[in-house]
UniProtKB/Swiss-Prot annotation:
Pfam families: WD40 (PF00400). This is POC1 centriolar protein homolog A. The keyword Cytoplasm applies. The keyword Coiled coil applies. Residues 400-427 form a coiled coil. Keywords: Coiled coil, Cytoplasm, Cytoskeleton, Repeat, WD repeat. It comes from Xenopus tropicalis (Western clawed frog). Residues 331-340, 348-361, 371-380 have a biased composition (Basic and acidic residues).
Length: 441
């Protein structure tokens, strides 16, 4: 059982926003979670069950991006009101504000050393600032449409940006030059980020795809077509071996990057999932959606071999366009397929949550080469038949899971109505007793 991963499970379920949740991020100490919303509010959720959440008000329009500093002492938020705010994540909610752009600020991100900020805007520019006193340093200006996202590389030497001009640009922070443009997306790119090793980038796009490039060779090495809707956000597991994606199709997808396949499909949000983020240690991930909810999930699937996986997080050997399983311990490479079990946490109204994890045999679109090209045609046909059968079974299981979720919701509504009737009856009895009492002199 040592190499057998467990299924992700729902841990917490937060309600408090009054409109679509657009962005989420964990405090590096994993004790707090920040979320921004179209309701213009920043919420700080405390992971301890009994601690109250903080609502920070200051932005005049929707918050589109939040990011904790590496120290956890500050939170940066970017807004449609064209400003960036730096908040202290305490009960006082103190903040400083600066006008960052002449258009909507869609993205804000700290550098790895916590000394710099990078912002991206509808004014078609990317700007870099000092955190101390929010001093403007320089601007990157080659995009010809809105810039939706910008991130520092882990070592802080590079910046990656994604724009509605359908390009992803890689910038050298020192020379301030664009060193490469990736133009292989059929749609707009909503989100882009660096792999923890700094050797690759992944992008989420409106053409329902997720693509991974090796930035040393400027080569597309993985191409996933697993969503049926626009992909809004993604997050790398800190080990670098997993990628989680959030989509308008109401699902989260967990991808195994080493084996190039889909691991899990998670159902929980009612409507588009707009944001997803792993915690700094990878133990949890959070998601936000148009249903105004924030969900925290326990990763689980990395627990059995996390220590081993970290050993293989080498800057020069991962995702080199060759053998995707080169960094996986031999015991884990050919583990048998299994059906993942549905798991729910009984915390903060979990009856609204429905989570299923699909079988891992779901086909992926490869760009580098087909992993089955060496098999005879007959065997290949058999494999396709088996895969088709498994997909059908998984589809039926998914329908059953959804049905159970609906039944649970109906049962919960019945329980709530019954409790309300009992409360009303008790109140009526109490009033009746008080009315029959005669005053004593």
């Amino acid at each position: 059982m040592a190499g057998q991963p467990e299924d992700p499970s729902l841990e917490r379920h937060f309600k408090g926003h009054r409109d679509t949740v657009t962005t989420v991020d964990f405090n590096p100490n994993t004790k707090q979670l920040a979320s921004g919303s179209m309701d213009s509010c920043l919420m700080i959720w405390n992971m301890k069950p009994q601690m109250r959440a903080y609502r920070f008000v200051g932005h005049k329009d929707a918050i589109l991006s939040v990011d904790f500093s590496p120290s956890g002492h500050l939170i940066a938020s970017a807004s449609r009101d064209k400003t960036v705010r730096l908040w202290v994540p305490s009960v006082k909610g103190e903040s400083t504000v600066f006008k960052a752009h002449t258009g909507t600020v869609r993205s804000v991100s700290f550098s790895g050393d916590g000394q710099s900020l990078v912002t991206a805007s509808d004014d078609k520019t990317i700007k870099v600032w000092t955190v101390h006193r929010q001093k403007f340093l320089f601007s990157l200006n080659q995009h010809i449409n809105w810039v939706r996202c910008a991130k520092f590389s882990p070592d802080g030497r590079l910046i990656v940006s994604a724009s509605d001009d359908k390009t992803i640009k890689l910038w050298d922070k020192t020379s301030r030059e664009c060193i490469h443009s990736f133009c292989e997306h059929g749609g707009f790119v909503n989100f882009v980020d660096f792999h923890p090793s700094g050797t690759c980038i992944a992008a989420a796009a409106t053409d329902n795809t997720v693509k991974v490039w090796d930035i040393r060779m400027n080569k597309l090495i993985q191409h996933y077509q697993v969503h049926s809707g626009v992909v809004n956000s993604l997050s790398f597991h800190p080990s670098g071996n997993y990628l989680i994606t959030a989509s308008n199709d109401s699902t989260l997808k967990v991808l195994d990057l080493l084996e190039g396949r889909l691991l899990y499909t998670l159902h929980g949000h009612q409507g588009p999932v707009t944001s997803v983020k792993f915690s700094r240690e990878g133990e949890f991930f959070a998601s936000g959606g148009s249903d105004e909810q924030v969900m925290v999930w326990k990763t689980n699937f990395d627990s059995a071999s996390y220590a081993d996986l970290l050993k293989y997080r080498q800057h020069d050997q991962f995702l080199n366009g060759g053998d995707y399983t080169s960094g996986v311990p031999a015991a884990d490479r050919h583990r048998p397929e299994r059906n993942a079990q549905t798991d729910q946490a009984d915390d903060l109204e979990p009856r609204h949550i429905q989570m299923s994890a699909k079988d891992r045999s779901s086909p992926l679109s490869y760009t580098s080469r087909s992993i089955d090209q060496h098999h005879p045609q007959a065997e290949d046909g058999n494999l396709r038949t088996v895969a088709s059968t498994l997909e059908h079974i998984v589809g039926q299981l998914d329908i059953l899971t959804r049905t159970v979720g609906i039944l649970e919701q109906r049962l919960s509504l019945t329980e709530d109505k019954l409790k309300e009737c009992i409360d009303n009856q008790q109140a009526t009895v109490s009033l009746s007793h008080s009315a029959t009492k005669t005053p004593s002199f």
